[in-house]
Amino acid sequence: MSEEQLKAFIAKVQADTSLQEQLKAEGADVVAIAKAAGFTITTEDLNSHRQNLTDDELEGVAGGTASGGCDTSMFCY
């Protein structure tokens, strides 16, 4: 997966409330959700690219705010 794929997935999530709700669910499988949305993302990809994402991208993935928290998959809420 390229950084562009990850950023494209994040952009899609930011614009799609259905994806946001799926990612907010307890135990959400980010890789499976991304795959269902047409993206090929692995857990390793998420972990290796996490440090390259801006705070705004991380916060916006699931409609989160800086006062929220991050789950183990890298997405903040």
Swiss-Prot record:
Alphabetical list of InterPro entries matching this protein: CHP03798_Ocin (IPR022516), Nif11 (IPR012903)
Recorded GO CC terms: extracellular region
Signal sequence annotation: none
Induction section of the entry: Down-regulated under nitrogen starvation.
Localisation: Secreted
Propeptide: 1-64
PTM-bearing positions, type 2,3-didehydrobutyrine: T65
This protein's record includes keyword Secreted: yes
UniProt entry tagged with the keyword Secreted: yes
Record location of the Lanthionine (Ser-Cys) cross-link: S67-C70
Entry keyword set: Secreted, Thioether bond
Organism domain of life: Bacteria
Primary localisation category: secreted
PTM comment: Cross-links are proved in vitro, when coepressed in E.coli with the ProcM lanthionine synthetase.
Chain positions of cross-link Beta-methyllanthionine (Thr-Cys): T72-C76
Function of the molecule: Lanthionine-containing peptide (lantipeptide) with unknown function. Does not show antibiotic activity against Lactococcus lactis 117 and Bacillus subtilis 6633 bacteria. Organisms that produce this peptide live in oligotrophic environments at very dilute concentrations, suggesting this peptide is not secreted to influence other bacteria.
Protein name stated in the entry: Lantipeptide prochlorosin 4.3
Taxonomic classification: Bacteria, Bacillati, Cyanobacteriota, Cyanophyceae, Synechococcales
